[in-house]
Amino acid sequence: MKLIIFTGLALLLIVSLIDVEAQNEGACLPRGSVCTTNHASCCSKLSCDCYRRFEKGVEKGQKCWRIPTGLRYSKEKE
């Protein structure tokens, strides 16, 4: 009887841990999604890259996106 109870509790613990891990993986932000400078919510191998937008010399805010770590974008010379 004790073996059945122990086995049931162990199985319940394993299922709970698998469910928590799956929920944590779904909480990260995927590539290309809007982000803040909080790097904790990035999926693996992604970082939050931000830039400031200007229109006619007036700042229009900051935009941040999830991109692969180490990738840099630059303005193309005209």
From Swiss-Prot:
Q: What is this protein called?
A: U7-lycotoxin-Ls1f
Q: Where is the signal peptide?
A: 1-22
**Of which family is this protein a member?**
Belongs to the neurotoxin 19 (CSTX) family. 07 (U7-Lctx) subfamily.
- Main localization of the protein described in the UniProt heading: secreted
Gene Ontology CC terms, in alphabetical order: extracellular region
- Where found? Secreted
Alphabetically list the UniProt keywords.
Disulfide bond, Secreted, Signal, Toxin
Question: Which GO molecular-function terms appear in the entry?
Answer: toxin activity
Name the Pfam families on file.
Toxin_35 (PF10530)
The organism's superkingdom is given as Eukaryota
**Post-translational modifications reported in the UniProt record:** Contains 4 disulfide bonds.
Propeptide spans which residues? 23-26
Q: Let me know which tissues express this protein, per UniProt.
A: Expressed by the venom gland.
